[in-house]
Structures are given as C-alpha cells and as structure tokens.
Amino acid sequence: MIRRQIQDTIEARMFYGKAIIVIGARQVGKSTLFKMVLENRDEPTLMLNCDEPEVRELLAKANSSELRLLIGNNLIVVIDEAQRVENIGMVLKRITDNFPDVQLLVTGSSSFELQNKLNEPLTGRKFEYHLSPFSTGELMKAHGLLSVKQTLENRLIYGSYPDIMNHETDAKELLYNLSNSYLYKDLLNLESVRRPALLSKLLTALALQVTSEVSYNELAQTVGTDNKTVEKYIDLLEKCYIIFKLNGFSRNLRTELKRAKKFYFYDNGIRNAILQNFAPLALRQDVGALWENFFISERMKANQNAGRYVNSYFWRTSQQQEIDYLEECDGQFCLFEMKWNPKRANTKFPASFLSAYQVKDKCIVTPENWIDWVIE
C-alpha cells in the first residue's frame, strides 16, 4: 500500500486527548489510512462504520452510560463516514470529554459543515486533516521518478484515486460508478438538494468550463434554474471535495477583474467520467484544460502535504492579460503558466503584474519540468 504523506503527522498526534479527523471525498483512502496507522499499534480498537443504519442509530441516541458500554475496554475508536450520524459533533464531544484515555479516529466524506455538525461542539478538541487522491509526491516515494513520468498521460485521463490506480484495467467502469452519484451520495441525502438531475447537469457544465471563467447567471441559464440554486449547489459540491474555486486576484490595478472565478476538479478522472470521455490525449481537443486542471490540483496537494500556507488565485484584466495560476505567501508571488506543448514555453508574463507586485518565482509549466513544482 502507498504510504500517505499525512500518516506520520497522525501517528505523532495519537493520544493527545483530541479527536483526529480526516475528511475528503469518498474513496480517497481515508479508511485505508487509518488501517495503516493501526498496523503498528496494539491497543484494543473498536471499528464503527456509519454507512450501517444500526451504527448510525446507536451513536445518535447513545448517552454517556451507553457509550461506556459500547466502548468497553477499547482504547482506540474508529468512526468511519461520521457525517452520516445525526448530531455527530455532540457525539464526538461526549466521547472526548468523558473518555480522555480513548483516541478517536474519525473519517468524513464531506465537510461536516454541510449540516453544521462539527465545528462548534469540537472547538479545541480535534486535529483535522484533508486527504486527497494520491499526490505526485506520494506516488514518487512508492514507485520512483521514472514511473511518475511514464504514467503522466494515464493520470491526466483517469486521475489518481487509489482504487483506479490499483485496478487500471477497470478504470473506466470504476470511475463511472464513482461519478454516478456515489461520490456525492452525502449531498443527495440533504433536504436542500431536491433535484439530482440538475446537479448532474451542473457538473457537466462545470466540467466543460474547466480553466474558463464561470458566471453563475450563465450556468443558471444553461442548466435551467436560478442563480441562487446554482450558487447553493456549487457550494455543496465544494464541500464534498469534488470541485474547488479559484478567485481572480485583484488589488492594485484598476483593470483587474475583481469578481472573476474559475472552478477546477480535485481529480481529472472524475471530470472525464462526468463528460464520458476517456479518449487518449492525441485524440482530444481539451488537452490544455486537462493539463491545467491536473497541475493546479497537484500543486495544491503538494502545498497541503508540505504544510505550505498560500493564497491561490488566477489573474486577468479587462485588457485580456492573464496568468493561469498564482500563489501569494508573505506578500510575495509565485506565477505559473501551463503549456502542454514545450515549444510554446516562451510565453512572457504580463509586465503590468511584474511591475505592480513582488514576484518571487515564475514558471512556464510543461511536461518537461512540472515534477519539480508538485513534490513535497
């Protein structure tokens, strides 16, 4: 099994008197991560899977005495898919408060804020981490540099979900199953999501517009609804870790677009499954979009795994000057332009940005140099 970057961090945080919570989309390997953590431990452990109705009901209704009977002599309690339990925040608080010697390990496949379940009850009582599909750094440590280079096209098309990479011959079927609602099954359980067909249309529209600026008004017209519904559904898709937003950067220049936004997918394979397009790169018209989506998502994984805290944006002006992706850290900027064809790597960054802001680094990212920017 491929060792996840955050495993060392989790192991170092065990028995600090706080719950350890790992959130991320379904099937990114959260349960496997905890199994790997537990392989090296001998404490008695209780495993609870909240996809099972009886487990959900038991946890939701249990008082402190009933929790004591449930936990027994176990020193580690693993609660899987915890977001499915009503009032899960209070349940976890009750366990951490009443059983200080018990280590809680909790997974959630969507942001608990979907139902405002977690933050307030567990303030000061948790370590929380986000797990993504495999990062380039994790794959390099497991398989080496040559393998990472050789599998680039495959990852652009099929993505980096663990199950997909472990069963490449079944990648299409597995991705279709994952993208056809299983990935956002928690979202579909919400009362506020009354139109699953609309959600599917919206995902398709977003997949087609990857790397392009998005207008809620235009999306609403495309899928046949109103702006408010589009905004609400997009917010929920972000909280299920299917898509993420980049805002346009604007500060000093009057020509900068102030309300611009783009949406990217956490994983290329999910984006391609939504569009039902797994054609090889040589036969595609969207290679540039695949490359940009892939690099930005990999860069964000690398920043997260390395503990680099940056603000991420794109940049565009009313004069059509643009920068694909930029990061701000401590008042300095790193600029990135993505070019799949290395022969086009002589692009220059806009002089107006270079003169207005303090630029630490800039790079035209191609298949020849990308790895240096996405390893932890």
Language-model features, listed with the residues they occupy:
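Structural recognition of the conserved hydrophobic beta-strand(s) that form the central parallel beta-sheet
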Residues: V78, Q103-S109, H130
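Conserved Walker B catalytic segment
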Residues: Q83-L105
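A cross-kingdom feature that marks ATP-driven nucleic-acid transaction machinery
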Residues: Q7, A12-A25, S31, M36-T45, ...
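Interdomain hinge/linker elements that couple catalytic modules in large macromolecular machines
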Residues: H130-K301
